[in-house]
Amino acid sequence: MKLAELRSLISDRKSEDLQTIIVELYKKIPKKTIEEHRMDELVRDPGSYAGLAKALKSEPQRTLDELEPDIVEFVADAKNQYYFAPNSIIRKKDRPKWRFIVKRFIHDLQLTTDTPEDTAKAAELLEQLYALLCEATEHILFSTDDPFRSVGIAQERLYSIIVQMLRRDAPPKKWVAKAISLAIDHSLGRDSLHETLWLALLDHLNTAPLKELAIEEAERFLAGAKAQLRLVTKKSRDAWNKERALSNKIESLTELVLYCRFALSEYEEGAQFFLQHDPASSREVTYFRLLLRLLRADQKDLWLRFYQQAIREGVPVRDSLTKANQTITETGRLPAYL
């Protein structure tokens, strides 16, 4: 069938029919073809796929030795704002092409993992690109404030790709610690939360020992962050920024332990840990955040227990929590949302 005939046949199809066609066609595509041609990106963002496909076809597959100096140079140029501000290094017409350069790098690096050494190096280079995109969410490096969206890849997706590479060869303790560090040491994109990164990490923590190891490493990072926070003196704006960053890190690590405990079906242990370590400015906020997560985990009995505990402690509770408690009392079920 020619493309013109195909377009004609599908032009008036119902959306349900198109979904069926796409899913069945996707099932028939070999995994290698999906990866090489970034077919998942076509599904996620059809609008930008034409530019990506053009970039992928523009030059042959490069080796890791060829990629490394190009990536190092690109990262340095980007940090110098050569892809944003007027300069004599990157021509004006080439500056908007940075997104296609990054797409190509990410694509090529995933195809250069034939040996453990190559995998480790590819992961390291991907980490540099990840860190750059994270930095570009807070500082002007490109003509966008949402670099992950511009590149056409979700932050948690790129994070997951890196974690997958890290775990191929590194000992569990090493790659788990690296994965946690990668999440807490870099900024979040506009559409990202630490929660989405932790859920991506949990996909790789597919055994109980790995989840327990993640708890151990998260608690180690947490102790370090709390020790640093105690040393911050509140005498300058820089100190305020540092305090805020450390508090965010503590909040994120506390959340990771909670999710790992929940994944181990240790709901009460996770909830108690969260209450003890969450750095929110008030107990009202901490209890709300905990009860929200217990609701998502469908833990009705624990939800009621901690709601009643908050009342006994004299903690003000939000109207949404009061209504949720009423719903449980009347129906015996948790509400769908708060």
Give the ranges of each region predicted by the language model:
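Eukaryote-biased, non-catalytic alpha-solenoid scaffold regions
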Residues: 34-338
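Basic helix-extension-helix modules of the SAP/HeH family
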Residues: 1-38
